[in-house]
Amino acid sequence: MNSAARMGLQYVLLFGASGVSLPFASLWFRAQGLSGAQIGVLLAAPMLGRIVTGPLLAVWADGFRTRRAPIALLGLVMALGYGGAGLLDGFAPRAVCWFIGATAAAALIPLSDVLTLRLAARDGFTFALPRGCGSVAFVAVNVGMGALLLKAEVDVIVVWVTLMGLAIAVTAALFLPGEPVGEGATLRKRDRFRGLGRLVVDPVFMTAIFAVGAVQAAHAFQYGFSA
């Protein structure tokens, strides 16, 4: 299996999870007796927290020798978080677990994008090819889960995203190429934060970030309460 196919499989799993969690999580929360306000808090908290968790996880990921190592670990964390949300009762424990699972799931996509871009430049394939596999998977599981929920219990939602997290972890550890994070020795934590600081003070970069954030905020509301 070449690197493009391996990354295509990774994106199928990634978007196979988000194609269920984004539109159907609120349906599961409602079945647990949560109010609309509580559901909004649960869905919004990981996205607001991403202002901090996103950069920190990026710096953390650059501390590994290979790009696939943090992807595998985050897949496992995603499974544990979503699985814990399904097993625990009470708003607070469920909120903490969902925050952990959703934060890990969100970080997996940009980390996979970085790996894919590096491999595409090295091996000569088009980035859109494996990424497109993920888009197809998103639509397919979205429609498939919607049809399944006409007959199945809503708990299948949490079971699905938990299993997807485990599949991502196994696939990353065993099948993704062992692309190094950088040439030579691993960067010290201080040097990794210095690179982050240069981005934060770049006005063009920050303007783009705020623009993308506005788009994502609109998507979040639409997806979160679409079911």
Where are these regions (language model features)?
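Helix-loop junctions at membrane interfaces in 12-TM secondary transporters
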Residues: N2-A4, G86-W98
